Structures are given as structure tokens and as C-alpha cells.
């Protein structure tokens, strides 16, 4: 059995994570990423504008007075990347963004009366699509809208997703002046053959220029995204990509497994599955990446995220206040999330809500004077309990049953009798250690945390979902 101890400088359990490839290969291969619980496939159209406004009003009454986060979805892309599963619109017509910004402003005008004042923003994220599809004047216009309704604060976390192929050094400097202090840079792979196969041609030079500009502009953190499992990738090619990425010295790095779901994401039908690496090759690639990143000093945060030891994510992991939200691991995730733009997903109190996914339907709702809520979900007490448990597993890698008994008034061992029986099987496999009043995820279990969290997912246990998920490792 090939078990590799990972050289990690920061760990909540003071034990080095272990990459046990035989164990990884033996367990169920797909499952939720748990950026929310319940997962988005549980959202339903019985939750609409009225339910969303009710949740906002409860927040304003002080019942759910959490810090506030804002997500803005910019759906436009110049070209299509075949692997992509995001909600996007492919166009080169910048005037479409002018019309879209008008509707963002309409949405904020409709939202404002229900926000209860001009709140401070703990967190801001521009996602897409490609947020930097917007030109400098359009970005300025969106930021003017943000400042009209919210207050930016010195220690806020304000991030934007960047496509280095379509942004200049001057635009990056402009983003810094506007107030952005964190950047996520899409790379995926530097190998030309892989890039051609997924229709994303991106040079090292243009990527470096953007990252250098971010540092010049004073960005606190630069994160890069990679994907393994793409066509023509192999262990040798990924070595070159990792070495090239490390020369850019990013503060954070996300290493995602490519989820091939062509029945859901039509662009993926253009990917030649005959040249996609097999399971063993993908495990080889993952193992190499994990070993190399940790040997170079990056801390394994969880799932597919790595960060430098002095990065806020690593500090949050070490000190036990790491959180998880729709953007992944975060230090500010325990916020109420207001989300605007087509298809965007928000979280207010014990509710989730999603805007219309079709841009014409999004525009039509706003033209009619309605918030464009397409669907959502009201969590019940069991959902809230399980959401907290899954959050603790994903971010702290341990559970203390007594906390849940105190907060929720339940006898934990009886309430979760079936789940704890399943945990005994995972203990036999070496993924968890069970104790009288809790459990701890083992070094082997750190890489399989999604499999462990799935045990507490009511909807999966009762087969109430037909969703197709990405692989857990």
C-alpha cells in the first residue's frame, strides 16, 4: 500500500495528512462539495421573491444579524472553455455588458429597501463568467453602485476572478484602486496540447504579467486555479505545469478534479474522452501535485485547497475559525450573502435563494418590478444541525457531540445512531477516530473529507437527490 505522509506546516489535529491512494481508489468516487447544505439540487420553485423578502426582513429585525457579504455574477466570456460548468454567455459585444449593468442597478434598487440601511461589507466577490469582460468604465460603474448601497471597510475581503488572457496590467492596477485586494487567476494547465484540447490558449507571460501587476497594486492574496483530469494531461505534463505555477509564487492554489458531465454542460461534449486520463493516471497526478506543493511549503487546507503558512486561510485553519461558502474555503464565510446578477446564489439566515438562470427571464422579472428569484430553500432545524456538523467536518476535521447537544437540545448518539454506525465502518478503514463524546478525522481521512461528510447528509441517505456530483478526490 502506497501511503505518503504530507509535509504540512499547519494542521488542526497536529498530525500530517496522509495520501493513501489505495484507500482513495476503494471508496465511492463522487459526492457534493458542500459549499452549501442542503446542496443546490434541493432548491425548489416554491421559494420565490416573497420568501426571500421575508428572510431579509427577519435579518433587519435583528433575528439574524450576521456580517454581510455581496456576490455579483458577471456572466460574459469572450470565448468558451470546453471544460467549464459555469453559467455564462459567450460574446465579444461589450455593449451587452452595459445593458446588464443597468439591470444590476435595477436589482439593487429593488433590494435596497429590504436591506435596512447602508451596511458594511465584510466580503465582496465578483464571479462569472469572466468579471474582467467588463472594461474599466464598466467596472467603475459597478463599483459606484456598490458604494451607493454598502460601505467598504479596511479589513474587508474583496475578491475578483481574473482571466489573464483578457486583462491588462493597467486594468489590474485599476482594480486595486477600486478596492479589490484578492484575486483568483484561472490557469487550469500550461501545457499547449491540453490548452488546445479545452480551447483555452494562455501563455505563461500574460499570466505572470497579471500576477506581477496584482502585487504592484497591493493585492493581499493571489490565488491560482488548476484542473487535473483534462484531455492529454499526464503525470509528466502536470509536473511541468506545477513547476511553472510555483515559479509564479501564488499565495493560494486550488487543484480541482475535472468533472465530465456533458449531459448537463453542453460545451463538454466537445472534449474527446479518448484522450482523458484514466483513474490511475489521475491519482498519480494528484499525488505528485499534493507532495510537491506541501514539500514547497504550502499548507493543505482541505479538499483541493492549499495556501502559504502565513496566508489568512492557513491561519484560520490553525486557529479553528476556517469556514466554507459558495466560493470555497474562506475566513469570512459565516456571513449573510446577498447575491445579485443572473443565476447568482445567496444565503440569508436559514434560507438559500437563486436568481433566474436565463438572462431573458432575469431581465423580465426586473422589468416587472420583481426581484428575480427563481428558486430557493428554507432550512428546517434538522438541516441547520446537519449544516453545522458538515461545516465542522470540512473545516475543523472534528466533532464534539456535547456542543450539538447543548445548542440543539438533542441526544447526539441517539439522534445520529445510524450515522454513527456508518462511522464505525469508516473508523475500520482508518478515516476517523471515534471517542465517547466526539470524533476526529485522521490524517488519511483529510483527503476523503467529502466521503466522511456525506454520512451526515440526510438527503443523500434517503436518496432524495438525483444530482450528479464531481469526484470526491
Where in this protein do the model-derived segments appear?
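Flexible, acidic/Gly-rich N-terminal and inter-domain linker regions that tether
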Residues: 1-68
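C-terminal scaffold of the Radical SAM
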Residues: 3-4, 67, 90-114, 120-413, ...
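Local cysteine-cluster metal-coordination motifs and their immediate loop/turn environment
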Residues: 72-88
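Short alpha-helical scaffolding segments that buttress acidic/His motifs in well-ordered protein cores
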Residues: 84, 388-390, 452
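Short amphipathic alpha-helical interaction segments
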Residues: 411-425
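A short, conserved structural fragment
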Residues: 427-437
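Minor-groove-contacting beta-hairpin "wing" of winged helix-turn-helix DNA-binding domains
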Residues: 438-442
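Short, amphipathic alpha-helical interaction segments positioned at domain boundaries
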Residues: 444-473
Amino acid at each position: 500500500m502506497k501511503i505518503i505522509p504530507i509535509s504540512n506546516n499547519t494542521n488542526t489535529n497536529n498530525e500530517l495528512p496522509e495520501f493513501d491512494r489505495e484507500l482513495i481508489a476503494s471508496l465511492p468516487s463522487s459526492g457534493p462539495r458542500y459549499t452549501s447544505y442542503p446542496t443546490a439540487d434541493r432548491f425548489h420553485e416554491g421559494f420565490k421573491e416573497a420568501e426571500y423578502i421575508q428572510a431579509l426582513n427577519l435579518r433587519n429585525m435583528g433575528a439574524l444579524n450576521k456580517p454581510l457579504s455581496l456576490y455579483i455574477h458577471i456572466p460574459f466570456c469572450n470565448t468558451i472553455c470546453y471544460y467549464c460548468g459555469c453559467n455564462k454567455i459567450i460574446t465579444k459585444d461589450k455593449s451587452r455588458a452595459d445593458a446588464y449593468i443597468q439591470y444590476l442597478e435595477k436589482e439593487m434598487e429593488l433590494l435596497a429597501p429590504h436591506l435596512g440601511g447602508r451596511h458594511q461589507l465584510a466580503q465582496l466577490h465578483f464571479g462569472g463568467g469572466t468579471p474582467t469582460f467588463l472594461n474599466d468604465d464598466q467596472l467603475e460603474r459597478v463599483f459606484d453602485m456598490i458604494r451607493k448601497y454598502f460601505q467598504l471597510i479596511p479589513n474587508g475581503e474583496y475578491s475578483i476572478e481574473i482571466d489573464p488572457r483578457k486583462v491588462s496590467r493597467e486594468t489590474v492596477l485599476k482594480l486595486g484602486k477600486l478596492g479589490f485586494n484578492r484575486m483568483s487567476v484561472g490557469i487550469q494547465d500550461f501545457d499547449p496540447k491540453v490548452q488546445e484540447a479545452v480551447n483555452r490558449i494562455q501563455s505563461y507571460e500574460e499570466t505572470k504579467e497579471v500576477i506581477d501587476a496584482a502585487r504592484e497594486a497591493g493585492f493581499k492574496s493571489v490565488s491560482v486555479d488548476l484542473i487535473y483530469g483534462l484531455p492529454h494531461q499526464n503525470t509528466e505534463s502536470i509536473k511541468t505545469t506545477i513547476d511553472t505555477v510555483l515559479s509564479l509564487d501564488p499565495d493560494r492554489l486550488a487543484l480541482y478534479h475535472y468533472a465530465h458531465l456533458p449531459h448537463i454542460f453542453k460545451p463538454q461534449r466537445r472534449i474527446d474522452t479518448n484522450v482523458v486520463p484514466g483513474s490511475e493516471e489521475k491519482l498519480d497526478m494528484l499525488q505528485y501535485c499534493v507532495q510537491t506543493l506541501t514539500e514547497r511549503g504550502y499548507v493543505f487546507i482541505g479538499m483541493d485547497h492549499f495556501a502559504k503558512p502565513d496566508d489568512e486561510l492557513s491561519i484560520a485553519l490553525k486557529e479553528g475559525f476556517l469556514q466554507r461558502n459558495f466560493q470555497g474555503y474562506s475566513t469570512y464565510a459565516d456571513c449573510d450573502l446577498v447575491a445579485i446578477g443572473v443565476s447568482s446564489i445567496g444565503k440569508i439566515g436559514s434560507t438559500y435563494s437563486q436568481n433566474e438562470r436565463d438572462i431573458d427571464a432575469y431581465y423580465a422579472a426586473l422589468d416587472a418590478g420583481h426581484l428575480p428569484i427563481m428558486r430557493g430553500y428554507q432550512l428546517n432545524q434538522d438541516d441547520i444541525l446537519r449544516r453545522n456538523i458538515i461545516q465542522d467536518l470540512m473545516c475543523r476535521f472534528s466533532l464534539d457531540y456535547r456542543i450539538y447537544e447543548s445548542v440543539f437540545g438533542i441526544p447526539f448518539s441517539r439522534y445520529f445512531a445510524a450515522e454513527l454506525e456508518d462511522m464505525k465502518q469508516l473508523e475500520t478503514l482508518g478515516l476517523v477516530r471515534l471517542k465517547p463524546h466526539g470524533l476526529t478525522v485522521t490524517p488519511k481521512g483529510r483527503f476523503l473529507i467529502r466521503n466522511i461528510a456525506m454520512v451526515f447528509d440526510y438527503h443523500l441517505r434517503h436518496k432524495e437527490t438525483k444530482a450528479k456530483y464531481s469526484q470526491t478526490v
